[in-house]
Every structure is written in C-alpha cells, then in structure tokens.
C-alpha cells in the first residue's frame, strides 16, 4: 500500500459538522472514513436536533448545546431551555464572539459567551468557541475564567501571533476548509505553530467547502486534512 492509499484510508474525527442543515438523507457512505464526529447546536432548536441525530447514527457521535453569537440577543428567551440541554449535552457551544458581522451587539455577545463559559466550568464539559475578529476579547475572557474546561477554537483563522498567544492557554485549534483557500497563507503557516496533540480537523458541514469541492455540500475531511498533514511532515 502506498502513502497516498494509506492516507485516504485513515479514520478521521470531524469536530464540527452541522448535520441538521443538510438537505439530504445521510447513509453510512458519508461516514466511512469517520471515527467519530461532533454535531454542534447554535440555538435551542438546532441543539435538540443535534441530540436527535446523534442518537440515530451508527457512527460514534457527540452533540453540543449552545447559542451562536449571531443570536446572542435571544439569550433571555432561550436561557432556561439551554440550561437543561447543557446538562444532557456532551459539549457546550457553539458560542463565542463574532465582531465581523455584529448581528447581536458586543454586549449581548459577551453576556452570552460568559453564560456558556460558566456552565462549561460548572459542568466540566468542553466548550466550542466561535472567534471571528475578536481574538483579544476571546483571549481575555478565557484568561479571566482560567480556561473553564477543554476549549476548542472552532474554524481557527488566527495568524501566527494569535496562534502563539492561544497556545499559552492549552486550547485546541480546529482547522476547517478555509486552510485550503489561496487567501489563507497566514493560516497555513500558523498550522505549523500548533502542536499535533492540539490540532483538530472539522468540515463545518455544510459550510466552508474546500476549494476543490466549491459549490457542493461540504462532507470531505480528506481535502482539509491533506494540506494540514503536509504542514506537519
């Protein structure tokens, strides 16, 4: 068996796939190279759906409950249901800060993020963090909470400067299809700064399709993992 063949037959872990959003029925062929996967929630409805899908799959799967920073303004109406889901879920999130779109105010996003951090620490469950144009604020809140539990930085896009800073906090960096983009040179270099035991992969299905598959639903870890693997050879 040559190196290319053995690489294609490796079992992968997909740490972030929104299977709730796929407009198709999934069969086992979609997961033939997957060892296990994580289905994140972004509000009460999608978190409940993540739980339902996770229990129906034959492949090993985990699910999370959370409220996305875009919808942080809905926290007051979803707080009670989220608290109940947090107890059942395997992970907390997707949460965090997105100062690129600001679909909720920064104050609403911070309140929502702190809410998730508190429960992650209280329940000792990993937390999935969305961090876009908010590196300093995210870093400061994690320092304030002294790392609530295992922290996964979802679809990491930070350059070498912020990769180095967050490494100090012993977080996990999850790399998505963005790493295949021509515009992601700094990210491709920053992957070299991540210890292999802190490096995760994700599809972010159905988003962030790798360049060779643009226009299709994103179901491929192979196209994401190949450039990542090359950076660690």
Per-region residue spans from a language model:
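Aromatic/hydrophobic pocket-lining residues that form π-stacking "cages" and hydrophobic walls in ligand
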Residues: 50, 116, 224
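Flexible, gly/pro- and Lys/Arg-enriched active-site loops
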Residues: 181-182, 200, 216
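Conserved beta/loop motifs at nucleotide-recognition and modification sites
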Residues: 204
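A metal-dependent hydrolase metal-coordination microenvironment
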Residues: 29-80
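His/Asp/Glu-enriched short active-site or ligand-binding loop at hydrolase and phosphoryl-transfer sites
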Residues: 170-182
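Divalent metal-binding pocket/active-site signature
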Residues: 2-12, 17-28, 44-45, 74-76, ...
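Single conserved hydrophobic/aromatic residue that forms the stacking wall/gate
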Residues: 222, 226-233
């Amino acid at each position: 068996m040559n190196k290319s063949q053995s690489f294609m037959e490796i079992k992968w872990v997909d740490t972030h796939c929104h299977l709730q959003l796929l407009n198709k029925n999934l069969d086992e062929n979609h997961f033939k190279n997957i060892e296990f996967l994580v289905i994140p929630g972004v509000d009460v409805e999608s978190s409940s759906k993540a739980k339902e899908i996770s229990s129906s799959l034959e492949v090993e799967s985990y699910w999370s409950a959370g409220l996305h920073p875009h919808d942080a303004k809905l926290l007051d109406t979803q707080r009670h249901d989220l608290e109940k889901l947090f107890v059942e879920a395997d992970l907390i999130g997707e949460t965090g800060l997105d100062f690129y779109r600001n679909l909720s105010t920064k104050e609403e996003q911070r309140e929502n993020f702190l809410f998730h951090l508190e429960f992650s620490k209280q329940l000792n469950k990993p937390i999935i963090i969305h961090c876009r144009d908010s590196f300093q604020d995210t870093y400061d809140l994690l320092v304030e909470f002294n790392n609530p539990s295992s922290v996964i930085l979802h679809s990491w896009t930070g350059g070498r400067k912020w990769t180095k800073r967050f490494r100090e906090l012993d977080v996990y960096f999850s790399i998505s299809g963005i790493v295949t983009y021509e515009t992601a040179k700094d990210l491709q270099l920053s992957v070299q700064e991540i210890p292999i035991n802190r490096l995760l992969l994700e599809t972010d299905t159905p988003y962030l399709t790798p360049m060779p598959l643009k226009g299709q639903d994103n179901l491929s870890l192979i196209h994401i993992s190949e450039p990542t693997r090359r950076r660690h050879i």
